[in-house]
């Protein structure tokens, strides 16, 4: 493909009409294929932060950054901290290879996101990751089985079962660190 781009929208928030808003955006260009940062919001939760690390399978060729819809002319930066609506367009070299993107998050910090990525997705084998993910979900969804001749009943049941497995959730790093209700970092005991 001639125009290989990825848009990273760090200004989007869910339910802005309910008062959920962006209050901080930290961004770091780690190297030519890795970025990381922390997004801070307020609204449904008084204070909510998500740290992330994003690694591309190829170097970023060109970077365009926008704050509040305006293209910044000084796009050659390493670190940025703004409460503004922050978006990036990453342009990659023209070729026919697939572009892979790995994303990890942390409730604590970018170091946690990096450790989570290394522990949970160390390689670049997309097909193996897809197969492993399908196996994990199939095992979980097959723990309870129902019978019905109505496909709608089956879809409804297994969709509801899937939903029970994604929320509520334990949100912590692979090393057990998490951000408590007191906004301090704690460590969960293994097990």
What do the predicted segments below correspond to?
Residues 1-191:
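Beta-sandwich/jelly-roll carbohydrate-recognition scaffolds of carbohydrate-active enzymes
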């Amino acid at each position: 493909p001639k125009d290989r781009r990825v848009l990273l929208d760090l200004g989007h928030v869910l339910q802005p009409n309910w008062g959920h808003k962006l209050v901080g955006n930290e961004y770091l260009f780690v190297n030519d294929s890795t970025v990381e940062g922390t997004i801070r919001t307020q609204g449904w939760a008084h204070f909510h932060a998500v740290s992330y690390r994003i690694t591309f399978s190829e170097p970023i060729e060109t970077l365009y950054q926008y704050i509040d819809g305006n293209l910044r002319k000084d796009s050659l930066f390493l670190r940025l901290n703004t409460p503004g609506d922050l978006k990036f367009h990453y342009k990659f070299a023209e070729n026919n290879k697939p572009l892979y993107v790995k994303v990890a998050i942390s409730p604590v910090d970018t170091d946690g996101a990096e450790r989570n990525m290394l522990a949970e997705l160390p390689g670049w084998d997309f097909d193996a990751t897809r197969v492993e993910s399908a196996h994990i979900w199939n095992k979980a969804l097959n723990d309870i089985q129902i019978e019905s001749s109505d496909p709608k009943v089956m879809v409804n049941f297994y969709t509801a079962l899937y939903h029970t497995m994604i929320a509520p959730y334990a949100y912590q790093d692979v090393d057990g660190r998490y951000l408590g209700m007191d906004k301090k970092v704690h460590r969960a005991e293994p097990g």
